[in-house]
A protein has these predicted regions:
Chain B
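H-loop/switch region of ABC-family ATPase nucleotide-binding domains
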Residues: 191-192
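Conserved ABC ATPase "signature" region
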Residues: 109-127
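Conserved ABC transporter NBD signature motif
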Residues: 56-64, 73
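Conserved beta-strand-loop-alpha-helix hinge in the C-terminal portion
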Residues: 211-234
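Conserved ABC ATPase signature
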Residues: 131-135, 139
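The feature captures the beta-strand-to-loop junction immediately N-terminal to the Walker
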Residues: 33-35
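Helix-to-loop junction immediately C-terminal to a conserved catalytic motif
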Residues: 48
Length: 277, 266
């Protein structure tokens, strides 16, 4: 059983000559994390819009194929059920933050879903602590840095425990240390709660240790899909921001010897002890 | 030259920038690095004259930003914001690029010609008639580069330019930065993306809580034994170079792979 099934999906925006999605098919099993990668303008955002049902509900065009969430066609799911099934964290947190104070922002979704006050307070406190931003709870959002705002946006979605979490470049505004921390924290939370996730990222290294699958898109098509380590090794294109140590290995040895940076450094260490750098 | 003299700035509680003094010369590539909220963007805005110091002064070619009209500052300093949505408002991509040029007094036809050239440079010619806000995140970012490139200021500030950019766009950005430096412009980059900055070995200011805590070339920064105290992520090429015992760290994957090939496989 899959949390997400995309079957032969094609979409052309009204007035546009080319298909934005061209016969896209992919499945994501429950509890798994997938990175969706591809160059700017390849159709990643369009695919996310289709997965969330925004396409074709709010974007006109020619739509073929189907998207199933938890076994149901996304177009037949009520808006309320959809909100509980899919959580979407935007690339730019400004697009989704609506409250004045951090705590109220994180509680906003639960309040709208009609939970009782104690439950909301408890859940909100927990998620703020889990993401390490509890001390920000009483701060006005406008006083936060972009990175802090992104964490609040993530908290506001995770607190609703959706079945499928969609993160559109969630760490692009964060510094690497903060990005890694967010990645590992989000990973821990979603694994514990059994949430599945699709992560759109250019900086693949941030999530490559956590993700299970990777899909590569190009000009509206899925050009590769599978185990993330295998996809990264197969990848020979020029569009993705592959980690520097993978690049070095491909150029120096013609293949990837170590898939984790730490492993590669250990290999270099061991070989230099044998007298060869 | 851009000169900061004991500059302070506050958003209301505490100082976001505290007592910074530095000079940026023509033809220099300067990077401001540090964590989210360290004050990098505030420094960039001060240098672009968007905000004025509460104490101290910012001089752009001897013009004190506190008593210079913003229209005179923008002729010299162009800033590309981290979030492209903050600076896009025209109805088409072409008009967006032409907007600043027309404000600077260029005739419509000349402005159009300059805008088209800049859009070509950034691979956006096919989008000229599209509304800017219909572009993807990465495309919008490229558009903001094209806008500033078109008006050709002497000092160009990029606030987190690598955010949301794919590899090809980053390669284009690298080419653009190198060309700008060669042509005598100053390029100022605020970023936490050490992997991207590393190739340039820029003059680097490490910012923490609104203060400069280290300055020098980036190679020197990561060759120090105590660089970890600044909580910056070391570029992978720097770490690999050190493991290999290279006296001069490699700045690109090509350079490093050649060194590895030269000494045999592991």
């Amino acid at each position: 059983m899959h949390v997400l099934e995309v079957k032969n999906l094609s979409f052309t925006y009204r007035g546009e000559p080319k298909k934005a999605l061209d016969n896209v098919s992919l499945n994501l099993p429950y509890g798994k994390v997938m990175i969706l990668a591809g160059p700017s303008g390849c159709g990643k955002t369009t695919l996310l819009r289709a997965i969330t049902g925004l396409i074709p509900k709010f974007y006109e065009g020619e739509y073929k194929g189907e998207v199933l969430i938890d076994g149901k066609n996304v177009l037949s799911i009520t808006q309320r059920d959809l909100v509980q099934s899919i959580g979407y964290v935007f690339q730019n947190p400004e697009n989704q933050l609506v409250s004045y104070i951090v705590e109220r922002e994180v509680a906003f979704g639960l309040e709208n879903m009609g939970f009782d006050k104690d439950y909301i307070i408890n859940k909100t406190e927990n998620i703020l602590k889990e993401l390490g931003i509890y001390e920000l709870r009483n701060r006005p959002l406008r006083t936060l840095s972009d990175g802090q705002k992104q964490l609040v946006a993530i908290a506001g979605i995770l607190v609703m425990e959706p079945k499928l979490l969609i993160l559109d470049e969630p760490t692009s505004t964060l510094d690497p240390a903060a990005a890694k921390k967010v990645a590992s924290t989000v990973d821990q939370i979603i694994r514990n709660k059994g949430i599945s996730a699709i992560i759109v990222e250019h900086r693949i290294d941030i999530f490559s240790d956590f993700a299970d699958f990777m899909a590569v898109m190009e000009a509206g098509k899925i050009t590769d899909f599978g185990d993330i380590k295998e996809v990264l090794e197969r990848y020979s294109g020029d569009d993705l921001r592959v980690p520097a140590f993978i690049d070095v290995q491909k150029k120096a040895y013609g293949r990837v010897i170590a898939r984790k940076f730490e492993d590669y450094l250990s290999l270099l260490n061991a070989s230099s002890k044998r007298g060869k750098p | 030259m851009i000169r900061l003299e004991d500059v302070y700035y506050t958003y209301g509680t505490g100082y976001a920038v505290e007592g910074i003094s530095l000079e940026i010369n023509e033809g220099q590539l300067v990077a401001f690095v540090g964590h989210n909220g360290s004050g990098k963007t505030t420094i960039a805005k001060l240098m672009a004259g968007i905000i004025k110091p509460v104490k101290g002064s910012v001089f752009i070619d001897e013009m004190d930003t506190k008593n210079t009209k913003h229209s005179n500052i923008v002729r010299k300093v162009g800033m590309v914001f981290q979030n492209p949505d903050y600076q896009l408002f025209e109805s088409t991509v072409l008009e967006e690029v032409m907007f600043a040029l027309k404000n600077m007094g260029y005739e419509k036809e000349k402005a159009k010609e300059m805008a088209i050239k800049s859009l070509e440079m950034f691979g956006l010619s096919g989008y000229a008639q599209r509304p800017p806000l219909s572009l993807s995140g990465g495309e919008k970012k490229r558009l903001t580069f094209a806008i500033v490139y078109a008006w050709d200021p002497k000092y160009i500030i990029f606030d987190e330019p690598t955010v949301g950019q794919d590899r090809k766009n980053l390669q284009n950005l690298s080419v653009m930065i190198n060309e700008l430096i060669k042509s005598g412009k100053s390029v100022i980059i605020t970023s936490h993306d050490m992997e991207f900055l590393w190739q340039f070995n820029p003059l680097t200011y490490v910012i923490e809580k609104g203060k400069v805590v280290w300055s020098g070339y980036m190679k020197e920064l990561f060759s120090q034994t105590d660089f970890s105290m600044y909580n910056l992520t070391e570029p992978q090429l720097s770490a690999i170079s050190r493991k290999l015992g290279l006296k001069q760290p490699a700045l690109t994957a090509e350079e490093l792979s050649e060194v590895i090939k030269g000494v045999g496989s592991i």
